């Protein structure tokens, strides 16, 4: 048993230049762990609370000194003395100390920083990689990456309503090969955008945010980029996209207002919008759609899942917010067939693991994800392997805070050697073989 002796938090910066919480944790044996907390731009309204100072004279109100103080003055007093390897007890103690359902008192950013630092210190204490500590000897599945290469919606200033357009190297044989395929496609995409006179400046997650004309043009350009890189769309590299539909849902009319449809924009009922998505699925090698409808319209999600869920992966992000209560509701209602996992949506590693396990037991896939405001912390790369989750969403082929996760995955694959497994399209166990074959044959 190794006792936690010291916990210290400080304010550092994320990839957008905004403050975030960094926590360092030490044990009596000298083991050490550090955790840095990410932050989202497009956030679900039911996420755990990210505590910000609100002082407009400092970082435009985005400072996190309150969260830092909560670690140094409150959480440290509670957690010092705990066995560093008892992750569940540490996380539950912080949840109890907070005492709110959404971690509003201490802040999920304070709690998560300690949770990650404790896990890393425990791995250091036991002299094992983090993925082994979290997942045990059976941690061996390397994830298929979702690489966000074109941005729209809240992540860009253009006429594209959907927030993210991603490539997934489903035909690769290893994560190293998948990353190479993604990199080659990314650079060919850049060349195509240059040829068409579009900007190749990159956004928060490393993807391009060109001023595209409508919602279909990104799919056309991605297919061209995949082919120019020497790969077959669908068979080698499939396409995924995140609608982030809550961002363009009109609560007053109950319709989805899309500026990228028609000459002057167009509004759709839920049924009409799902029909539009269905037509995209039929036309392009789509393997996954995230947040196709507003996060509060569960009955519409049922309808969408019934129509699209046998064809493609339907991912709940804002819908589930990595929360087992919402996920259990979705499973019971037959809503979605996949969950996006973001550690800061729920606030502890213990609760994150519980959400992944619940999803897998129900036949849902679990996609471990970054946030738009990231850091050099690579915990999610270890977590996705630890849980054999099989899919990771961690940005494009640019920006060091994104590449750091890919580099860590390649290190892990090297460490696992012949015991590692990359499943590609076969990791979509939420789709039957016929659906997978349809996607890879387009």
Curated annotation (Swiss-Prot):
GO cellular component: cell surface; extracellular region; phosphopyruvate hydratase complex
Binding annotation for (2R)-2-phosphoglycerate: 163, 342, 371-372, 393
Mutant lacking the gene: phenotype: About 6-fold less binding of bacteria to human collagen.
Subcellular location(s) of the protein: Cytoplasm; Secreted; Cell surface
EC number: 4.2.1.11
InterPro entries: Enolase, Enolase-like_C_sf, Enolase-like_N, Enolase_C, Enolase_CS, Enolase_N
A single GO BP: glycolytic process
GO molecular function terms noted in the UniProt entry: fibronectin binding; magnesium ion binding; phosphopyruvate hydratase activity
Keyword set includes Magnesium: yes
Pathway annotation from the record: Carbohydrate degradation; glycolysis; pyruvate from D-glyceraldehyde 3-phosphate: step 4/5
Keywords annotated in UniProt: Cytoplasm, Glycolysis, Lyase, Magnesium, Metal-binding, Secreted
Catalytic activity: (2R)-2-phosphoglycerate = phosphoenolpyruvate + H2O
Co-factor note (free text): Binds a second Mg(2+) ion via substrate during catalysis.
Stored Pfam families: Enolase_C (PF00113), Enolase_N (PF03952)
Active site: 205 (proton donor), 342 (proton acceptor)
Region named Binds human collagen: 73-140
Binding site for Mg(2+): 242, 290, 317
Function in brief: Catalyzes the reversible conversion of 2-phosphoglycerate (2-PG) into phosphoenolpyruvate (PEP). It is essential for the degradation of carbohydrates via glycolysis. 'Moonlights' as a collagen receptor. Binds host (human) collagen, which may contribute to pathogenicity.
Free-text domain note: An internal region (residues 73-140) is capable of binding collagen.
Family (UniProt): Belongs to the enolase family.
HAMAP family, A to Z: Enolase (MF_00318)
Protein's name in the database: Enolase 1
């Amino acid at each position: 048993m190794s006792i936690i002796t010291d916990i210290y938090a400080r304010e550092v910066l994320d990839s957008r230049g905004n403050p975030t919480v960094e926590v360092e944790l030490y044990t009596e044996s000298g083991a050490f762990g550090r955790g840095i907390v990410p932050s989202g731009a497009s956030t679900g309204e039911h996420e755990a609370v990210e505590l910000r100072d609100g002082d407009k004279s400092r970082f435009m109100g985005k400072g996190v000194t309150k969260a830092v103080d909560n670690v140094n003055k409150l959480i440290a007093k509670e957690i010092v003395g705990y066995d560093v390897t008892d992750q569940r007890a540490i996380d539950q103690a912080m949840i109890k100390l907070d005492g709110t359902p959404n971690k509003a008192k201490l802040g999920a950013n304070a709690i998560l920083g300690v949770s990650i630092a404790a896990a890393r210190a425990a791995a250091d204490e036991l002299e094992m990689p983090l993925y082994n500590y979290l997942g045990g000897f059976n941690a061996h599945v390397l994830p298929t990456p979702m690489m966000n290469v074109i941005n729209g919606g809240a992540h860009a200033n253009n006429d594209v309503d959907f927030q993210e357009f991603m490539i997934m190297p489903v035909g690769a044989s290893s994560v190293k090969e998948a990353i190479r395929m993604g990199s080659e496609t990314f650079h060919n995409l850049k060349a195509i955008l240059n040829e068409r006179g579009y900007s190749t400046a990159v956004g928060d997650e490393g993807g391009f945010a060109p001023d595209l004309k409508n919602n279909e043009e990104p799919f056309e350009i991605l297919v061209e980029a995949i082919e120019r890189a020497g790969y077959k769309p669908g068979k080698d590299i499939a396409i995924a996209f995140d609608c982030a539909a809550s961002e363009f849902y009109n609560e007053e009319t109950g319709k989805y207002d899309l500026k990228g449809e028609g000459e002057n924009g167009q509004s759709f009922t839920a049924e009409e919008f799902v029909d539009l998505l269905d037509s995209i699925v039929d036309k392009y090698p789509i393997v996954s759609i995230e947040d196709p409808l507003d996060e509060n319209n569960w009955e519409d999600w049922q309808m969408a899942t019934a129509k699209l869920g046998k064809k493609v992966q339907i991912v709940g992000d804002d819908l589930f917010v990595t929360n087992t209560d919402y996920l259990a509701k979705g499973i019971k209602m037959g809503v979605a067939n996949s969950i996006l996992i973001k550690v800061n949506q729920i606030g502890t590693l213990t609760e994150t693991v519980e959400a992944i396990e619940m999803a897998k037991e129900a036949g849902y896939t679990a996609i471990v994800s970054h946030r738009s405001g990231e850091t050099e912390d690579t915990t999610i790369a270890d977590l996705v392997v630890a849980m054999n989750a099989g899919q990771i969403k961690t940005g494009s082929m640019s920006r060091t805070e994104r590449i750091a996760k890919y580099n860590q995955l390649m290190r892990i694959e090297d460490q696992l050697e012949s015991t590692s497994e990359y499943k590609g399209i076969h990791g979509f166990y939420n789709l039957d073989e016929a659906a997978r074959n349809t996607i890879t044959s387009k």
